[in-house]
């Protein structure tokens, strides 16, 4: 992707919304870091003016019954100063790290998304995004709540990750998902109508859960899902579309399960493990609707279902 790759309004469509990074956490973290560093400086100053008196061992008892022994009052002051300074520096480092994570804003247009980092603007059309990846991280990682969105044109380029520090992140990800389906579905339906198959990349459920533990979310290994008017194929198992009967989405298990006419699962995986899974489900709806209407006269069944 080239720097300052920004297209004209006729290419991008109308600007729908601008999403910026929240600053409250950064401000709070900076203030807290300054407070702890200030306290460290104050305690150090006290150590230079407070008379030490008997410079023997000092024993401190905490409210939880913990006992701390120090060789002298000087050591107490040094320990307290060092601890406060360490906390302050850790807070400062954490704030700097989060600032780096939050240095990108986004503009969502009718036809694409603009990533803004300082003075650089990079545009990606929704129609070019093959992989839209949704996943959970942080404190909500075990709940499956979507707190991250990543996108790429294809597997040859890295993912661009958007985290929930973005203001109104949930509105952002819902808008991007909707516009992505609108942009991609007509071309996908056209390919199916021409007798071609379309490919969706899938991350196994085992891998999804593993990444929730390890945190290496963007290093993924995918397996293709092939879908055409005639067949559905995953992990070498090809079945006729005419044999597919139900598509179940379970909010509790996060799974999408596709079963054949005998009730046997053809695909069972975590929904968000399917990259561009909204487009996948919409495409599958079109294919199954066409199959149901196969005996009905229609000038253009695919076009009707896309509309």
Please state what every model-predicted region is.
Residues 48-55, 89-112, 116-118:
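Transmembrane-cytosolic junction motif
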Residues 6-8, 105-108, 222-227, 246-249, ...:
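Short, exposed beta-strand/loop patches in secreted or surface proteins that constitute
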Residues 113-114, 122-139, 232-253:
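Phosphoinositide-dependent membrane-docking surfaces
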Residues 1-74, 121, 127-194, 198-202:
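N-terminal membrane-targeting/pre-transmembrane regions
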Residues 97, 109-114, 145-146, 150-238, ...:
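N-terminal recruitment modules of adaptor/scaffold proteins
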Residues 102, 120, 221, 228, ...:
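Residue-level marker for the onset of beta-strands and adjacent loop->beta junctions
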Residues 36, 77-94:
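Canonical hydrophobic alpha-helical transmembrane segment
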């Amino acid at each position: 992707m080239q720097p300052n790759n920004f297209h004209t309004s006729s290419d991008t469509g109308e600007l729908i919304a601008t999403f910026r990074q929240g600053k409250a956490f950064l401000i709070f973290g900076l203030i807290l870091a300054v407070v702890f560093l200030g306290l460290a400086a104050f305690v150090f100053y006290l150590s230079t003016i407070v008379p030490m008196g008997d410079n023997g061992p000092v024993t401190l008892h905490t409210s939880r019954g913990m006992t701390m022994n120090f060789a002298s009052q000087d050591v107490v002051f040094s320990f307290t100063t060092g601890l406060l300074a360490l906390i302050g520096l850790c807070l400062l480092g954490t704030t700097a790290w989060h600032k780096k994570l939050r240095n990108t804003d986004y503009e969502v247009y009718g036809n694409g998304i603009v990533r803004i980092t300082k003075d650089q603007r990079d545009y990606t059309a929704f129609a070019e995004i093959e992989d839209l990846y949704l996943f959970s991280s942080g404190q909500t990682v075990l709940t499956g709540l979507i707190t991250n969105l990543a996108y790429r044109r294809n597997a040859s380029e890295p993912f661009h990750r958007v985290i929930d520090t973005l203001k109104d992140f949930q509105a952002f990800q819902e808008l991007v998902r909707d516009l992505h389906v609108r942009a991609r579905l007509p071309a996908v339906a056209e390919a199916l109508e021409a007798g071609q198959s379309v490919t969706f990349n899938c991350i196994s459920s085992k891998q999804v859960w593993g990444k929730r533990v390890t945190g290496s979310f963007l290093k993924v290994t995918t397996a293709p899902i092939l879908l055409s008017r005639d067949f559905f194929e995953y992990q070498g198992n090809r079945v006729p579309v005419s044999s597919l009967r139900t598509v179940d989405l379970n909010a509790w298990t996060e799974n999408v399960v596709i079963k054949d006419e005998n009730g046997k699962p053809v695909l069972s995986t975590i929904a968000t493990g399917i990259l561009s899974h909204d487009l996948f489900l919409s495409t599958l709806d079109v294919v199954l609707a066409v199959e149901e209407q196969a005996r009905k006269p229609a000038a253009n069944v695919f076009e009707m279902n896309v509309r």
